[in-house]
From Swiss-Prot:
In the N-terminal section; belongs to the ATPase B chain family. F(1)F(0) ATP synthase produces ATP from ADP in the presence of a proton or sodium gradient. F-type ATPases consist of two structural domains, F(1) containing the extramembraneous catalytic core and F(0) containing the membrane proton channel, linked together by a central stalk and a peripheral stalk. During catalysis, ATP synthesis in the catalytic domain of F(1) is coupled via a rotary mechanism of the central stalk subunits to proton translocation. This fusion protein includes a component of the F(0) channel (subunit b) and of the F(1) subunit (subunit delta). Two copies of subunit b and one of delta together form the peripheral 'stator' stalk which links F(1) to F(0). This is ATP synthase subunit b-delta. The gene is atpFH. NCBIfam families: PRK13428.1, PRK13430.1.
Amino acid sequence: MSIFIGQLIGFAVIAFIIVKWVVPPVRTLMRNQQEAVRAALAESAEAAKKLADADAMHAKALADAKAESEKVTEEAKQDSERIAAQLSEQAGSEAERIKAQGAQQIQLMRQQLIRQLRTGLGAEAVNKAAEIVRAHVADPQAQSATVDRFLSELEQMAPSSVVIDTAATSRLRAASRQSLAALVEKFDSVAGGLDADGLTNLADELASVAKLLLSETALNKHLAEPTDDSAPKVRLLERLLSDKVSATTLDLLRTAVSNRWSTESNLIDAVEHTARLALLKRAEIAGEVDEVEEQLFRFGRVLDAEPRLSALLSDYTTPAEGRVALLDKALTGRPGVNQTAAALLSQTVGLLRGERADEAVIDLAELAVSRRGEVVAHVSAAAELSDAQRTRLTEVLSRIYGRPVSVQLHVDPELLGGLSITVGDEVIDGSIASRLAAAQTGLPD
């Protein structure tokens, strides 16, 4: 019995311990487990719901994708049809363009071929015409007839309004023109009382003064400087030259420095011009004007035909004495050289300062002509003119330009026939060679 009671008490103690300390954690654990199961069930339900929603959305997405696919397919079909239509239209346009371009290219090739044929035929025709013309003008009478025909055409020409200046005035401005005119007027007034020796001395002194002004640039600058009062310049001139030059020369130099010059070099040009006038006046007194003119023009043609000699005479870096010596040597071998013409040439070559010798000599010859109130006509012909033709030409040109004309003839066989005339800056080209050249130039490219 005691064992039973002991066991009962032990059982009661065990039950108490279980109830006191074991049951509460177990109950809490079970309750937590129930909550976990309940939460898992809720999550499962939520997941099932989401799955159902996902299936619905998937189905909707499939439906939308199908609809979009059908839409894209329809649009692609429409685009393909439109592109096909555009390509077809472009192909048609391109075909038309290529066709038109081909036709244009054919036309261009045809025109080019025609042009080439015309050029070839034209050139051949011009060459053949040149041969015929050369054969025709080989006869002197036929060649002379071409000059007569040109003169007949020239007679129909209206009077020219061109103003012809000499080289001395063409390069001057208004102030220098007036000053040069005053100096020339002064020369004409004092030169009438001088004999040949006096004019020679005047020319030499003026040329020496020109050389002095060339070498003494400060003096030239002072004397050529425009001033309202020229008295100081005149006094300086007299102080320097009164005992070195004649009264006539000093009087002319007073006039020169008293006037206004556009540039400093114009004063030297004016002094040189007056020195030339003195020698031309000497030729006039001696009755040698025609001879001097002819020899000046002839020497100008010599320089034109001998460019080496012209270049040596034009080389102003060489001392003037050397160039004048070369000129004297060139003139020595020529018979009948007029002394006045030689003096004019020596004076001109010695005072060159950048100009070409051949042009300076022609300017000098034209000055000699202009002193007689005439103008120079440089005439080129294939052969010498007869006296009748020269007279007729002189009369026609005198009528056209309203002044007596001095004809200077240059023979150039390359002209074939007709004449080429230059008066001042005006050119009248009636040569056969120029007409053949114009025909050649007029051929299509």
